[in-house]
Amino acid sequence: MADINPTRMELLKLKTKIKLAQKGHKLLKQKRDALIMEFFEILDQASGIRDKVNNALEKAYKDLIMAQAVMGTLSVQEISYASKNDNIVLDLDTRNIMGVTVPVLEIENVKRTMADRGYGPYGVSSKLDEAAKEFEEALELIMELAEIETSIKLLAEEIITTKRRVNALEYVVIPRMAEMQKYIGMRLDEMERENFFRLKLIKARIDAREEA
């Protein structure tokens, strides 16, 4: 600490810096805690939606296999190609969670009627239509899951960054400034004592001369 200037002005500046650092530390801790709460809430949502996606896909593949068994694989493929959906629209927006920008995905025109898919109830297994409905539902859920999982990743990164900043302030920056404050206070006390003894010595010499 040899490069520190032990003056009262420096001590005042340091006290102000410590107060600001402590305030920043408190705000960052609040942000960290709020982010963690939000993170776990979204994590719970992801778990539920992931289960829904798996269930929808499982049902869809079962119905597809049954449709292939009834109609034949080639017929199912021909109908699938003919009923291709070119009207799906994906909109991307964003929202802010505690300073973190996360995506908002919106998918439109996914679910269709049998007529929209280009086939009728005759000559087509009901299982194929059920499979189509379930795949459409799964696609909407997959988009919702993608939005949530991306948000989880971004929040986790921000939590790690915020934790590092909290720890840096708590264990490095604030303690270091507190040590500097203590050092300057001690040096000022020493300097005051030295000045006091110096003045006392000067006064004693003056008194001695006057008596002589």
Curated annotation (Swiss-Prot):
It is a peripheral membrane protein. It comes from the Archaea. Keywords: ATP synthesis, Cell membrane, Hydrogen ion transport, Ion transport, Membrane, Transport. One of its GO terms (biological process) is proton motive force-driven plasma membrane ATP synthesis. GO terms for cellular component: plasma membrane. It is found in: Cell membrane. Its main location: membrane. The keyword Transmembrane does not apply. Pfam families: ATP-synt_D (PF01813). One of its GO terms (molecular function) is proton-transporting ATPase activity, rotational mechanism. Disulfide bonds: none annotated. Has multiple subunits with at least A(3), B(3), C, D, E, F, H, I and proteolipid K(x). Component of the A-type ATP synthase that produces ATP from ADP in the presence of a proton gradient across the membrane. This is A-type ATP synthase subunit D.
